[in-house]
Amino acid sequence: MTPEHLPTEQYEAQLAEKVVRLQSMMAPFSDLVPEVFRSPVSHYRMRAEFRIWHDGDDLYHIIFDQQTKSRIRVDSFPAASELINQLMTAMIAGVRNNPVLRHKLFQIDYLTTLSNQAVVSLLYHKKLDDEWRQEAEALRDALRAQNLNVHLIGRATKTKIALDQDYIDERLPVAGKEMIYRQVENSFTQPNAAMNIQMLEWALDVTKGSKGDLLELYCGNGNFSLALARNFDRVLATEIAKPSVAAAQYNIAANHIDNVQIIRMAAEEFTQAMNGVREFNRLQGIDLKSYQFETIFVDPPRSGLDSETEKMVQAYPRILYISCNPETLCKNLETLSQTHKVERLALFDQFPYTHHMECGVLLTAK
């Protein structure tokens, strides 16, 4: 695979290999055949970051080869959304012959949505001033004249200039209902929107008919908690990153959801609060004892659940676990399978043409 060529003819074989690999990894815990969710074979990534290489009068996007660390020029990127590809061409054309925008520019980040909105961040090794803002506004207006719905941001050390706004609003069709998700620049969002829809619909399917309340750790911008709210009486979700919490609060209002509460704290802190080890001011006004948590949802970082959180989640009748690293999922299952059994298993091909797998398991108490 090269950045400008995807081996689409190999997609089926690569996906089949992942299914076999996941089944083998899960064999100690389950004999289930994974439910498999395919990715689009191209234009599936909604965000991308490129270094910018200055070559005489020329200027272009590059990435570095992971093995050799050599530079690879990238003029098109079929893994990324069609909007990112349009913007890559338009940004280079707009910046190449503009000394103010070009000088000391070292990276461009792209974030797009299925609703065809974009935020483009230009990263600099220099101070950004009013002259930069004027030139950037002219570029933004020129891009919009090409029917590109784009917002520009300039970044430098301790500086962030958002010309209009630093977010875009995604609209996803999820099980017959449109969900609105605010996505903030430089915050985590799901990279593969088509796969995200399938993950949300699978999570809805495995929790349909649920009783009681849902607890979610690591909720980000509320991606899962808001979609799942329709299956539960109430949802309580935790997140540590301030921009994500603010986006989640916006998303609750935008989707007219009245049974979700987001609190800003780490999963480890919430574990302490639930166990009565510590009291937190951030939990004032929230009566944890009034919740009837029957299901806990976790979507941890690649490192998986720490041992304290492992113990905590074992207290719940049902555990819904989305994993971006099946190796740490299996490590967690060594503990979780002592008290719970695997009821559902899914493979989400979030990252086609790579070794990486995303998977989901529903665990129920034995």
UniProtKB/Swiss-Prot annotation:
Keywords: Methyltransferase, S-adenosyl-L-methionine, Transferase, tRNA processing. PROSITE patterns: SAM_MT_RNA_M5U, TRMA_1, TRMA_2. One of its GO terms (cellular component) is cytosol. One of its GO terms (molecular function) is tRNA (uracil(54)-C5)-methyltransferase activity, S-adenosyl methionine-dependent. InterPro entries: MeTrfase_TrmA_AS, MeTrfase_TrmA_CS, SAM-dependent_MTases_sf, TrmA_MeTrfase, U5_MeTrfase_fam. GO terms for biological process: tRNA methylation. Its EC number is 2.1.1.-, 2.1.1.35. It catalyses: uridine(54) in tRNA + S-adenosyl-L-methionine = 5-methyluridine(54) in tRNA + S-adenosyl-L-homocysteine + H(+); uridine(341) in tmRNA + S-adenosyl-L-methionine = 5-methyluridine(341) in tmRNA + S-adenosyl-L-homocysteine + H(+). The active site is at 324 (nucleophile), 358 (proton acceptor). It holds the Pfam family tRNA_U5-meth_tr. The keyword tRNA processing applies. The keyword Transit peptide does not apply. Disulfide bonds: none annotated. S-adenosyl-L-methionine binds at residues 190, 218, 223, 239, 299. It comes from the Bacteria. NCBIfam families: trmA_only. Belongs to the class I-like SAM-binding methyltransferase superfamily. RNA M5U methyltransferase family. TrmA subfamily. Dual-specificity methyltransferase that catalyzes the formation of 5-methyluridine at position 54 (m5U54) in all tRNAs, and that of position 341 (m5U341) in tmRNA (transfer-mRNA). This is tRNA/tmRNA (uracil-C(5))-methyltransferase. The gene is trmA.
